[in-house]
């Protein structure tokens, strides 16, 4: 919901923006409405065709030159279960949106790792806009962790990072 509202309230027209809503993350992002489907890729191809561009490489380059925030929640410091978090790397309430450079579970399984150049772009944009943000991770290896769809977007060489609010 917050991603859609942010898009609708946006006043920039310099770049094409979209909000892709998917489900089925808990079962592997499969199915026609999951992030592993080709819905997003096909939609980009259809938009290019509508604009008169039928070159296959254009779709690849459009996806590759895109930036994405994979909106999801992040684990906040839970005072009842402090042992599952790294106290220096855990998100806290009221410190702003959380950027997760690295997500995944069981070490590197199903992980995504945002590139530092994209993180720098985001930090500069948020600093310039005086918007509070923080970095965090989901928890200690094999104690915390969780799924992400960021890797499904990163497969297009897209710059992507998990971003969202901290919750218990």
Question: What kind of region is each of these model predictions?
Answer:
Residues 19, 66-70, 160-162:
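Short glycine-aspartate micro-motif
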Residues 1-2, 14, 35-43, 61, ...:
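Conserved active-site and cofactor/substrate-binding residues in soluble primary-metabolism enzymes
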Residues 8-12, 45, 49-53, 123-132, ...:
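Generic secondary-structure signature for well-ordered alpha-helical cores
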Residues 13-19, 53-65, 126-140:
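Flexible, glycine/charged-enriched surface loops at secondary-structure junctions
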């Amino acid at each position: 919901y917050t991603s859609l509202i942010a898009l609708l309230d946006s006043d920039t027209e310099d770049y094409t923006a979209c909000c892709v809503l998917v489900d089925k993350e808990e079962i592997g992002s499969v199915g026609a409405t999951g992030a592993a489907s080709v819905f997003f890729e096909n939609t980009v191809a259809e938009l290019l065709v509508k604009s008169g561009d039928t070159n296959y490489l254009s779709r690849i380059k459009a996806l590759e030159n895109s930036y994405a925030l994979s909106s999801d929640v992040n684990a906040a410091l839970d005072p009842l279960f402090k042992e599952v978090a790294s106290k220096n790397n855990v998100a806290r309430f009221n410190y702003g949106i959380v950027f997760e450079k690295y997500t995944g579970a069981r070490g590197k399984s199903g992980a995504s790792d945002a590139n530092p150049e994209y993180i720098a772009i985001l930090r500069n944009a948020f600093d310039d806009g005086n918007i509070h943000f923080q970095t965090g991770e989901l928890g200690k290896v094999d104690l915390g962790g969780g799924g992400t769809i960021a890797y499904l977007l990163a497969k297009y060489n897209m710059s992507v990072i998990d971003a969202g609010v901290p919750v218990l």
